[in-house]
Amino acid sequence: MSKTPERLVTSEVRDEDMTEASLRPLTLADFTGQAAARQNLSVFIAAAKARREALDHVLFVGPPGLGKTTLAQIVARELGVNFRSTSGPVIAKAGDLAAQLTALEERDVLFIDEIHRLNPAVEEILYPAMEDFQLDLIIGEGPGARSVKIDLARFTLVGATTRAGLLTTPLRDRFGIPIRLEFYTIEELERIVLRGARVQGLALEKEGANEIAKRARGTPRIAGRLLRRVRDFAIVDGVESVTRTLADKALSLLDVDPIGLDQMDRRYLNVIALSFGGGPVGIETIAAALSEPRDAIEDIIEPYLIQQGFLQRTPRGRLLTPHAFRHLGLKEPVRETPQYGLFPDQSEED
């Protein structure tokens, strides 16, 4: 079975993204976009420093690639404390979490990415750690088992998730500072691209940066990746400065259209449009038709299509909008007006 080729515009982390740490902003003042989140964080951080206390636990919610990890690092840097990072799937058992927590010093920041994927048994251990700064561990087995309490330094837990709905209510309620991150505007992405070009020593015209920003799907991680690919074309073509024309040529050859859709997006839209009459159709059916996992569709493909007005999630399934048919150059089918609010179809898998 052939392996699905990697998508250029996926917001998932790829190896090349990890090598560009120097492009990341180091302070809230340097961070572009997410104005409300930055303003609130600056107030909470200043207040915590003035009280000489640990910052309340923070939860970042939003699609991949919007800066959750970067903001977590900035929080630690602005507080002047140590930063430790892990992820939900890595913490397999209570001992793994205990090792992380007992290594923390006063007011340190522990970042848990994909916190919605924590083992339920580990999550139970996390509750008293977040609330009372204590670890309740069971030592031994059977009749000889005993409970041991370990005092922890007062720390800040920063969680990140793309699936807030999968968090249990007890865990979600223990975060005093919930922050939702939004997709970036083209203007914000343009500034990010221009900054990245300066760091890389690449001459980039403003119009060229705008062309890259328009195709970056509202996501800085994708903008950085597109910039690197355009840079490759500039080097091979031997041009001194990246213009809009060069950026358009490079990204068109890479099959990224003027609004950032790629072959996978168009395949998704075409499956619903041509195979299922524009919908509504259930997510499991779409996943089977595309031979893609449901999580990847919900986390990576759909958020941008919804944000662009191409797709609706309804009680009966996924439904393409007239805007999607116009973009695909297809005629919209005549559909009966759905009475979603009256008789919701309980068979939808969402």
UniProtKB/Swiss-Prot annotation:
Its main location: cytoplasm. Pfam families: AAA_lid_4, RuvB_C, RuvB_N. Residues 185-255 are annotated as: Small ATPAse domain (RuvB-S). It catalyses: ATP + H2O = ADP + phosphate + H(+). The keyword Hydrolase applies. Residues 1-184 are annotated as: Large ATPase domain (RuvB-L). ATP binds at residues 23-24, 65, 68-70, 131-133, 174, 184, 221. The keyword Transcription does not apply. Residues 258-350 are annotated as: Head domain (RuvB-H). It comes from the Bacteria. GO terms for cellular component: cytoplasm; Holliday junction resolvase complex. Mg(2+) binds at residue 69. InterPro entries: AAA+_ATPase, AAA_lid_4, CbxX/CfxQ, DNA_helicase_Holl-junc_RuvB, P-loop_NTPase, RuvB-like_N, RuvB_C, WH-like_DNA-bd_sf. DNA binds at residues 294, 313, 318. Keywords: ATP-binding, Cytoplasm, DNA damage, DNA recombination, DNA repair, DNA-binding, Hydrolase, Nucleotide-binding. Its EC number is 3.6.4.-. GO terms for biological process: DNA recombination; DNA repair. Homohexamer. Forms an RuvA(8)-RuvB(12)-Holliday junction (HJ) complex. HJ DNA is sandwiched between 2 RuvA tetramers; dsDNA enters through RuvA and exits via RuvB. An RuvB hexamer assembles on each DNA strand where it exits the tetramer. Each RuvB hexamer is contacted by two RuvA subunits (via domain III) on 2 adjacent RuvB subunits; this complex drives branch migration. In the full resolvosome a probable DNA-RuvA(4)-RuvB(12)-RuvC(2) complex forms which resolves the HJ. HAMAP family: DNA_HJ_migration_RuvB (MF_00016). This is Holliday junction branch migration complex subunit RuvB. It comes from Beijerinckia indica subsp. indica (strain ATCC 9039 / DSM 1715 / NCIMB 8712).
